Amino acid sequence: MNKVLVSALRYSQGPDATAGLATEMVGLGLRGPVCIIASRSAQKELESTWTTVFAAAGMAFVIHPFSGECSRNEIARGRAAAAACGAQVIVGAGGGKALDTGRAVAAELGIPAVCCPTIASTDAPCSAISAVYSDEGLFETYLFHPHNPSLVLVDSTVIARAPVRLLVAGMGDALSTWFEARACMRSGARNSRNGVSTGAGMAIAELCWRILQADGVSALDAMKTPTATPSPALERIIEANTLLSGIGFESAGLAAAHAIHNGLTVAPEVHAFHHGEKVAFGTLAQLMLEEAPQEEITAVLNFCTSVGLPVTFAEIGLHDPSGVSRLHE
């Protein structure tokens, strides 16, 4: 079985990075027309910048508003919009589900994808995977695409203005990366490319956990007292949530933490919680299933409580024991 490292073609992160979007795309040989699948908040925040940078590069673009759910119906709507404008590249802008939709549309059309996350709430931006849900928000399946994004462009100034809870959710998603990678390594499970992780993939996954421990609380403090330039700690957490976790989970694999997340989506009570919040809970459950050393469980528990991630059923909305029972069915 081959060792496989999986990553985006190019990753670019920094303050006001959106100003360089068209330049980065041209440098990769990407040309218009461009179809931007954008969440409402991303469009509100970035449309004026897109207009400026694409005009300067002589690239036509259209914006397709994202409905809020990465469903088969939404992917079909996005594909129709992209085909109608003759798009040669898809840009997904917004949160994880908008980016998942953008990658799915690009894969169906056989054209490159660019991801521009406006929040650091998941490790979705760098991946070649789309999590598909029903229109009502129930998890259905994963789509595995032939190619990772050609470009992931992360504007840390935009992310620093996002709600703090979304960064915390991203840390919850990133938290699982090392522990799921380790579980896959121990069991010999295959990664998303039908191989096993390289040493580099495992090292990146472990580094993700170390950065969360070192910088998580400081990054939250920085978001609560914003400055003109995002702090070094916040930049490191954005990178951990987005790049390190993205490479780690695709290169090393997923385990119980994400499976538990998927099961939780059947309970309506948890729909108000973000992906990473549920994954963090699943990570603790995975460590219990593995009978991990108590000091490791305590370290993860302490991290979760220090940044505000849920650690009990009640904290993910399951106050009624009957709701917990449904998860076994």
Residue positions per predicted region:
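ATP/NTP phosphate-donor binding region
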Residues: 1-89, 313
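Active-site segments that bind and position negatively charged phosphate/pyrophosphate groups
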Residues: 192-303
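A short, small-residue-rich loop immediately preceding and capping a beta-strand
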Residues: 82-105, 109-118
